[in-house]
């Protein structure tokens, strides 16, 4: 069922409209927990440590995605409410393209410097291979991760919050299934967990792309031009959400970095 974001809401209807987004956020926050459970169960503590060490790279990507998603959806929603539908769709298409381009740049940079990144994030030589393997395979799905973050907000803007919720739930279940399949059944190493996460991200990314390309609803892809003002406003609007996710990356980095005591005892 479709709901227009420009409709008049009662407190009850507003809660019903917002509830799928709330559940989506809860489900996405469980992704790392699922990966951690399967990695520790089938690969051991060293593999789990490696996944935690390189995860700030994923947090960085997620922070940028959420910044564009929340900030961009605010800009697009405002224009839809003002009746500027063509401008809203141009901004949506432009911001999606910018987000994907940034994710591709991050992917290329990580693939080129994965070893240095793993060491910078605190990897020891003992688990460096684990860190590099998880990081490389995880970052290959960076565009899908970016699109999942963007579509999560833009499905709500398009009046399809339930579709976004269904895709997020399916993605989470697929992540758990393929974690088990790759690690327990196929006997893969840590790259299996990264691929499972990537497959989960691909589901909402692919379905969302098909939807916004071919279903001409309230929001869909259209030809666009560069809009510097839209980009600036979206980054400003979404900066608080980006900082929150960057804080998670910094906390994770501080927990996994070697302490001065560790450095002194290793000499």
Question: Can you say where each PLM-predicted feature lies in the sequence?
Answer:
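Interfacial/gating helices of multi-pass transporter permease domains
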Residues: 39-59, 91, 126-130, 190-191, ...
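Membrane-interface helix-loop junctions in multi-pass transport and translocation proteins
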Residues: 172-205
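Interhelical loop/hinge segments that connect adjacent transmembrane helices in multipass membrane
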Residues: 1-18, 208-249
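Alpha-helical transmembrane segments of multi-pass membrane proteins
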Residues: 125-148
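Residue-level signal for short hydrophobic patches within transmembrane helices
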Residues: 11-30, 57, 61-64, 140, ...
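Membrane-embedded alpha-helical segments of multi-pass transporters/permeases
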Residues: 37, 107-112, 176, 180, ...
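Small-residue-rich hydrophobic transmembrane alpha-helices
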Residues: 48-108, 145-164, 253, 257
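Single conserved hydrophobic/aromatic residue that forms the stacking wall/gate
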Residues: 255-267
């Amino acid at each position: 069922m479709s709901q227009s974001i420009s409709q008049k809401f009662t407190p009850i209807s507003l809660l019903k409209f917002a509830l799928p987004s709330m559940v989506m956020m809860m489900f996405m926050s469980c992704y790392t927990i699922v990966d951690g459970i399967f990695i520790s169960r089938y690969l051991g503590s060293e593999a789990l440590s490696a996944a935690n060490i390189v995860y700030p790279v994923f947090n960085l990507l997620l922070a940028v995605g959420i910044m564009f998603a929340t900030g961009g959806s605010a800009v697009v929603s405002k224009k839809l409410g003002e009746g500027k539908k063509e401008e809203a769709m141009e901004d949506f298409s432009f911001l999606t393209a910018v987000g994907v381009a940034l994710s591709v740049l991050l992917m290329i940079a990580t693939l080129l410097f994965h070893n240095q990144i793993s060491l910078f994030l605190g990897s020891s030589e003992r688990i460096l291979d684990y860190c590099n393997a998880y990081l490389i395979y995880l970052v290959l799905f960076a565009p899908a991760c970016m699109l999942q973050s963007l579509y999560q907000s833009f499905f709500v803007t398009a009046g399809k919050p339930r579709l976004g919720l269904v895709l997020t739930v399916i993605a989470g279940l697929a992540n758990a299934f393929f974690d088990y399949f790759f690690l327990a059944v196929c006997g893969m190493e840590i790259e299996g967990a990264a691929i499972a996460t990537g497959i989960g991200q691909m589901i909402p990314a692919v379905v969302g792309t098909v939807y916004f390309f071919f279903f001409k609803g309230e929001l869909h892809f259209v030809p666009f031009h560069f809009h510097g003002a839209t980009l600036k406003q979206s980054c400003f609007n979404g900066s608080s959400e980006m900082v929150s996710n960057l804080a998670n990356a910094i906390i994770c980095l501080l927990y996994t970095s070697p302490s001065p005591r560790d450095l002194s005892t290793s000499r």
